[in-house]
Amino acid sequence: MATLINFNDTNKLLLTKQPSLFIDLASKDWIASANQAIKQRGAFYVALSGGKTPLEIYKDIVINKDKLIDPSKIFLFWGDERLAPITSSESNYGQAMSILRDLNIPDEQIFRMETENPDGAKKYQELIENKIPDASFDMIMLGLGEDGHTLSLFSNTSALEEENDLVVFNSVPHLETERMTLTFPCVHKGKHVVVYVQGENKKPILKSVFFSEGREEKLYPIERVGRDRSPLFWIISPESYDIADFDNISSIYKMDIL
């Protein structure tokens, strides 16, 4: 079982009731998004997320690859990347491709972020603008950090204020590093933007994002993603939320599925 909640104009939440269902629904949503885009415009442009949770989703996608109508029409991009070799366990590209190679996507449709290139952000933006109609991804996969960051958009960093560029290098002082990341202008162009929340350690930040009474300002980067025309879609594992927090939401905004 899972419950779909229209929380507000900019956020839709899918609360899964079993950990295994979380991965299953995330994978099905990805495959459905791919098939819909391929049917509608002959290609699926997706920005992948790093982290452990997406790797589980990728594995399930590969297991169910026979449900993809045409993997050769998939174009892979990344939402952010560390300054790490592609052979490193820190490389979002390397970790994802160790799994997604089994989809047999043409190499010329796989675009990694070249963090070793000082002009890499500019080059990646040009790729997005040249390859993707209107620079609008069909799907953008996001994670949620315990501090409320998403992609490599951390609080108190310059990338949060970027209004024009779609891709930047973002200095993250508290991590003593720099990362390449998509920006809010790029994410806001996305057709289907999904954030995956898994782990009991995410419960405090999720509660703070949705149930901080009396707080009007947006404290966390993740809160700046959703838009009225394209609400942020949350897929949430059961250990990451307290169901009691949602009891006061009217049933007209809830729908049980499965």
Curated annotation (Swiss-Prot):
<dbReference type="InterPro" id="IPR039104">
    <property type="entry name" value="PGLS"/>
</dbReference>
<dbReference type="GO" id="GO:0017057">
    <property type="term" value="F:6-phosphogluconolactonase activity"/>
</dbReference>
<dbReference type="Pfam" id="PF01182">
    <property type="entry name" value="Glucosamine_iso"/>
</dbReference>
<dbReference type="InterPro" id="IPR005900">
    <property type="entry name" value="6-phosphogluconolactonase_DevB"/>
</dbReference>
<keyword id="KW-0378">Hydrolase</keyword>
<comment type="pathway">
    <text>Carbohydrate degradation; pentose phosphate pathway; D-ribulose 5-phosphate from D-glucose 6-phosphate (oxidative stage): step 2/3.</text>
</comment>
<comment type="similarity">
    <text>Belongs to the glucosamine/galactosamine-6-phosphate isomerase family. 6-phosphogluconolactonase subfamily.</text>
</comment>
<dbReference type="GO" id="GO:0006098">
    <property type="term" value="P:pentose-phosphate shunt"/>
</dbReference>
<protein>
    <recommendedName>
        <fullName>6-phosphogluconolactonase</fullName>
        <ecNumber>3.1.1.31</ecNumber>
    </recommendedName>
</protein>
<dbReference type="InterPro" id="IPR006148">
    <property type="entry name" value="Glc/Gal-6P_isomerase"/>
</dbReference>
<dbReference type="InterPro" id="IPR037171">
    <property type="entry name" value="NagB/RpiA_transferase-like"/>
</dbReference>
<dbReference type="GO" id="GO:0005975">
    <property type="term" value="P:carbohydrate metabolic process"/>
</dbReference>
<comment type="function">
    <text>Hydrolysis of 6-phosphogluconolactone to 6-phosphogluconate.</text>
</comment>
